[in-house]
């Protein structure tokens, strides 16, 4: 069961959510946008609760199984947008963009996990294909869950590794994209 607890940390999945939200936010977004961004990015790891109910790591609903799939990500994205961002005044294309945003955030979890160096792989194509995948390059060290284990030397090494391979790229990409958007807006003829 211990290997089932090896994932990029919940903190790093949250950093990706905040970085993505910073780029995609249209002006000042409501608190629910930021909370849902983080929830969508970490939700797939709720599958670890299955261990308490006898669901094994490699099972369909086991850790890194269906709940880490792209199909599940789309379901979550559409449900999040439908439950929290649908109103009579919302334009359909804007609603679909919000659904896509939350779907991509949820999918980012399984994709990041596929870059880790441990476990059984990620069932990215579930429920259509039960194969569990890793990417050929796995620079992200697996992370312990639980405060005690996370505060160990191993946990500190994982944080340093995630700073390099997740936080730095996510924050850098957000800053570069946001700066590019601001510069493009400043240079557009309608602003002069």
Set out the residue ranges of the language-model regions.
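N-terminal membrane-targeting hydrophobic helices
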Residues: 1-192
């Amino acid at each position: 069961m211990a290997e089932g607890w090896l994932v990029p940390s919940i903190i790093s999945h949250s950093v990706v959510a905040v970085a993505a939200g910073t780029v995609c936010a249209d002006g000042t977004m409501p608190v629910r946008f930021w909370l849902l961004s983080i929830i969508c990015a970490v939700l797939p790891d709720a599958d670890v609760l299955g261990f308490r109910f006898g669901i094994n790591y490699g099972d369909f609903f086991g850790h890194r199984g269906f709940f880490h799939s792209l199909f599940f990500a789309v379901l979550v994205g559409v449900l999040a947008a439908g439950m929290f961002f649908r109103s009579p005044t919302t334009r359909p294309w804007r609603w679909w963009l919000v659904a896509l945003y939350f779907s991509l955030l949820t999918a980012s979890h399984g994709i990041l996990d596929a870059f880790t160096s441990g476990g059984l792989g990620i069932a990215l194509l579930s429920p259509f294909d039960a194969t569990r995948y890793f990417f050929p390059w796995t620079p992200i060290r697996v992370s312990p869950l639980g405060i005690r284990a996370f505060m160990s030397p191993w946990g500190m090494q994982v944080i340093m590794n995630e700073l390099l391979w997740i936080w730095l790229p996510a924050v850098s990409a957000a800053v570069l994209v946001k700066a590019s958007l601001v510069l493009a807006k400043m240079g557009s003829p309608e602003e002069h």
